[in-house]
From Swiss-Prot:
Keywords, comma-separated and alphabetical: Cell cycle, Cell division, Chromosome partition, Cytoplasm
A GO CC annotation given for this chain: cytoplasm
Primary gene name: scpB
SUPFAM superfamilies hit by this protein: Winged helix' DNA-binding domain
Protein purpose: May participate in chromosomal partitioning during cell division.
GO biological process, one term: cell division
Gene3D superfamilies cross-referenced by the UniProt entry: Winged helix-like DNA-binding domain superfamily/Winged helix DNA-binding domain (1.10.10.10)
Subcellular location: Cytoplasm
Primary localization: cytoplasm
Entry protein name: Segregation and condensation protein B homolog
PANTHER family, per database record: SEGREGATION AND CONDENSATION PROTEIN B
Length: 209
């Protein structure tokens, strides 16, 4: 095979991959006869991002690496490709997820203490199944309750490189503020994912407590 432009190889790999790719993973595409440094990979990624600046897709860096995705500006048109409405999220799920995001690591009991009601096992299971949260440790007290934290999958879903990019909450004990502020952000992401055809509908709907 004749010599290929490495930028084109990287572009093809990013489109072919179902998951974000790191510069290190992209470097593995090139053999010892045609080595390429990490700095070169990053430069080529920057060039690709610029190449697509006026296109319908964007090269986005998230926690797990780089990926191509549709620009949110085109969501009104892309939504017409899918008949399903995006899933609505229950207040209980929004509050539970927001508390994990902003107070991690946190136990189920601590979430219940703040919310004042029991946390549905179904909500915890769905967040775990979605891989938005995981058990990161166990509290060193009798019973050793699991402590939950967010994952790279969560960051990827929200197009974040780190939790530091999340908007601050002045008081995470204020559940009205949690639902309004975090819920608004989640709704925007869900709308975008629905436009891209990547938003599953397997999360609890608003009728849950």
């Amino acid at each position: 095979m004749s010599e290929v432009n490495p930028k084109i190889v990287i572009e093809a790999a990013l489109f072919a991959s179902a998951e974000p790719l790191t510069p290190e993973r992209l470097q593995q595409l090139f053999d010892e006869q045609n080595p390429i440094s990490l700095s070169e990979i990053k430069n080529l990624l920057s060039e690709l991002k610029e190449d697509y600046r006026e296109r319908g897709v964007d090269l986005q860096e998230v926690a797990s690496g780089y990926r191509f995705q549709a620009r949110p500006d085109f969501s009104p048109w892309l939504q017409r490709l899918w008949e399903k409405k995006p899933a609505r999220y229950s207040r209980a799920l929004l509050e539970t997820l927001a508390l994990i995001v902003y107070r991690q690591p946190i136990s189920r009991g601590e979430i219940e203490e703040v919310r004042g009601v029991a946390v549905s096992s179904d909500i915890i299971k769905k967040l775990l199944d979605r891989e938005w949260i995981s058990v990161v440790a166990h509290r060193d007290v009798p019973g050793k309750p699991a402590l939950f934290g967010t994952t790279k999958t969560f960051l990827d879903y929200f197009n974040l490189k780190s939790l530091e990019e999340l908007p601050p909450l002045e008081d995470v004990v204020d559940l009205e503020k949690i639902e309004a502020q975090f819920g608004e952000q989640l709704a925007l992401v869900v709308e975008k994912k629905a436009a891209e055809g990547t938003e599953p509908s397997a999360l609890p709907l608003a009728e849950e407590d």
